Every structure is written in C-alpha cells, then in structure tokens.
Amino acid sequence: MERKITLSKDDRMNFQNTLDNLKSNSKWQVLKTYLIEMKIKYPSEYFICTELSNTYHMLGMYKESEQASMEAMQLEPNDVLVIYNYAVALYSNEKFSEAIVQLNRILKRKINTIAYGVHGEGMKWAMSIKNDSLYLKAICQLNLGKLKEAYKLIVKHLAQRRRGVYSDFTKKQVT
C-alpha cells in the first residue's frame, strides 16, 4: 500500500518539532488538542492517528486510544509502529488475545525488514520495538494465565536488552 503524503516537507518538520516539544515537556492535553486539529486538517495521515492513540494512552483514555489506533491501522496496516501502538491500545483495554495477534505480526518480521523497510527507522529502533513487543506479549500471556510462556518471553526480553537500545519499559518494571 503506497502511503499518500498530504503534509508538505516543511509541514512535516513543523509537525515533528511540535510533537517532540510537547512530548518532552509532558504537555499531553495540549498535544491531544493539537493532534485532533491536525487530524481534521490531514485526515489521511496515519501517523497523526497513531500519535493521537499514544497521547490518549498517556492520558489514560484507553477506549479513545484504541479508536485512534484502529483508524491508523485502516490507513496503514503494515507500519510496525502503528501495529505496536494498536497492540498497546488493545492491551490497555484488556483485549490480551487480540494484542498478541498484533504483536506476533511484529515478532515474525525480520529485524532488517523492520529497520530498513518502507517505514523503518534504523536498527536500534527496530531492535527496541521488537524487544518491547516480546515484553508486551509476555504481559498479555501473564494476564491470560499462561505463566510458562510469559516467563520465557520475559527471559528472552531481558537477554536482548542492550545499552543504547531504548525500551518503553524499565528493568524494574520487567523484573
């Protein structure tokens, strides 16, 4: 599926700068308003929907997070970040089996495809999102009462953690 870009290069840079600034200052409510406005202005930009999903999640608005993620999935179902954010939204709404299905879509992909494919952002990012998918799958398994599977995934997640590779989860959360 070819991505239809509706934002100009300058608009994308301004968007990314605003996004980074509001995130780094934890201005989630302001970011939510900004993203809703951008979504109205650019309805075919899946990245806006997936960022809105993430923002809703940070605000504890899990139903809205899932809805925004579903919209992003309809626009671009093959972007690993979109899939991951959708899995997080499903997990947050206690849809653990559905989240596992999405996480498996990420985990089955080759690391080089994630890193350097159409939506890739490099090897460190690919390693990060794939490893965090392992941990999130483990937590879903745990919630489904599948302790052995969860334990194996957590051990694998911890073994693959590396300096310089970001994780959404601290070691304290994992252990």
Model regions and ranges:
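Conserved structural position within tetratricopeptide repeats
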Residues: 39-40, 70-74, 105-108, 125, ...
